[in-house]
From Swiss-Prot:
Pfam families xref list: Pantoate_transf
GO molecular function: 3-methyl-2-oxobutanoate hydroxymethyltransferase activity; magnesium ion binding
Gene Ontology cellular component annotations, sorted alphabetically: mitochondrion
Sequence similarity: Belongs to the PanB family.
Source species: Emericella nidulans (strain FGSC A4 / ATCC 38163 / CBS 112.46 / NRRL 194 / M139)
Lineage per the UniProt record: Eukaryota, Fungi, Dikarya, Ascomycota, Pezizomycotina
Name the record gives this protein: 3-methyl-2-oxobutanoate hydroxymethyltransferase
């Protein structure tokens, strides 16, 4: 019984309200949440770790976005919203903001892993990030890029990689770059029942062959090639196609010739929807970073975080933090008894 009294007493002190004016009754719910058998506070009742969870799913999440949901949006002419995410917090906020789709883009090579370009990221890298995103995305339809080197060798290689992305990464579909030449791979994947998003125009994984990050489809010949690629990708079974860095007029015409939605990135608002890299559009990067022309910066997350961290540093240096409200109280008699016990300890020689 002595142990039970001590454990219960400890729970009360750990959960004492920061405002001493609050009645003791405000503490009682904490005791009710303790384990009855031992009276030791349950994990749900105590969270004193410095590694705090980012929170549970929303209380009333949206209905899960499915391929049928996306088809209905397309038929109604309502633009489809897509945003990249590379980890739990970025997916959590994208989902909470109501994104229809979340893309685990291979752009995470640069924005999350500090790599030079997307060609460095591996399938195993993508799987780690996919799982992180999948844990947060309760409603949005999730898709992951197949990274360079994981699908170009053969349709069978593409299928094996796609299966791993869906099975191990826990996302709903895959995206791969390329036009007519990738049709066999797309067909093999979709035949196995895995949704595929195509990607034509500027394909960053092939930027070396394209002469860098250049606008595509600016000549009649190139525009016709773009349309041919789009039709081939659609015929192979892709349920959606990303069009990147293409003049808006060309992207609009291509969109009109297709029976599946297009998602533009640097391709104007004539597409069926839009996608941006979250880090770019939220301004979560240091000053001086190059931004493509098509990016609109909607926030300045870097600056907000910088100011907060600088203030934290200053308050730690000045001992303004932690203040009393950030600490756990101890009964005065316990403190006196502890100090007395310490004073009675023999001095070390």
């Amino acid at each position: 019984m002595t142990f039970l009294r001590i454990a219960t007493k400890r729970a009360i002190y750990l959960h004492r309200p920061a405002n001493p004016a609050l009645p003791t009754s405000s503490i009682l719910p904490v005791l009710h949440s303790t384990n009855v058998a031992t009276r030791v506070p349950s994990p749900c009742a105590i969270r004193h770790s410095s590694h705090s969870p980012l929170g549970a799913a929303q209380a009333n999440p949206r209905k899960k976005v499915t391929m049928q949901t996306l088809r209905n949006l397309y038929k109604k002419g309502e633009p489809i919203t897509m945003l990249t995410a590379h980890d739990f917090p970025s997916a959590h906020v994208a989902d909470a903001a109501g994104m229809d789709m979340i893309l685990v883009g291979d752009s995470l090579a640069m924005v999350a892993l500090g790599m030079q370009d997307t060609s460095e990221v591996t399938l195993d890298d993508m799987l780690v990030h996919c799982r992180s995103v999948a844990r947060a995305a309760q409603s949005a339809f999730t898709v992951s890029d197949l990274p360079m080197g994981s699908y170009e060798v053969s349709p069978e290689q593409a299928l094996q990689s796609a299966i791993r992305i869906v099975k191990e990464g826990r996302v709903q579909g895959v995206k791969l770059e390329g036009g007519e030449e990738m049709a066999p791979a797309i067909k093999r994947i979709t035949t196995a029942g895995i949704p595929v998003v195509g990607h034509i125009g500027l394909t960053p994984q092939r930027q070396n062959a394209l002469g860098g990050f250049r606008v595509q489809g600016k000549s009649t010949t190139d525009a016709l090639k773009l349309l041919k690629d789009a039709l081939a990708v659609q015929e192979a079974g892709a349920f959606m196609i990303v069009i990147e860095a293409v003049p808006p007029e060309i992207a609009s015409i291509v969109t009109q010739k297709l029976s599946v939605p297009t998602i533009g990135i640097g391709a104007g608002n004539g597409c069926s929807g839009q996608v941006l890299v979250q880090i770019d559009m939220t301004g979560n990067f240091p000053p001086g970073r190059f931004l493509p022309k098509f990016v609109k910066q909607y926030a300045n997350v870097w600056n907000e975080a910088l100011q907060g961290i600088q203030q934290y540093r200053e308050e730690v240096k000045s001992r303004a933090y932690p203040a009393e409200q950030h600490t756990y109280p101890i009964p005065k008699e316990e403190l006196v008894e502890f100090q007395k016990a310490v004073d009675e300890l023999p001095e070390e020689k």
